[in-house]
């Protein structure tokens, strides 16, 4: 990181289930390593949740927040029938914003969350 100019780093930690202690420890180690190389890093820690997950998403988000200190949520798969209602509880209980929504499979389908547009789409 120090030898090149980097503005963003995205880490895909697929399979890091909140119930797998060893995998959660690995992701915490990644975070500690980043902080050693760049003071203050990571600057954002987003949890990407599948809108179809349901009530399990709340316990999942709590565990990731306890481990990493979440700064926001990205909610995907809103192009289907899922409404993602659990995200309201998650954002409220963890005091983190919903920052992005996924409404398809393309890059352009990851959008900055717009609360008014989100509510309008519910009806």
Regions found by a protein language model. Give the residues of each.
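P-loop/Walker A NTP-binding module and the surrounding RecA-like catalytic core of P-loop NTPases
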Residues: 1-123
């Amino acid at each position: 990181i120090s030898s090149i100019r980097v503005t963003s780093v995205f880490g895909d930690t697929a399979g890091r289930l909140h119930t797998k202690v060893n995998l959660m420890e690995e992701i915490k180690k990644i975070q500690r390593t980043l902080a050693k190389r760049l003071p203050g890093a990571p600057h954002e820690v987003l949890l990407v949740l599948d809108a179809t997950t349901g009530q399990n998403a709340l316990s999942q988000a709590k565990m990731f927040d306890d481990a990493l200190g979440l700064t926001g949520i990205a909610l995907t798969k809103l192009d289907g029938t899922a409404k993602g209602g659990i995200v309201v509880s998650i954002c409220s209980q963890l005091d983190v914003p919903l920052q992005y929504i996924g409404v398809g499979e393309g890059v352009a389908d990851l959008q900055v969350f717009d609360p008014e547009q989100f509510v309008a789409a519910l009806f």
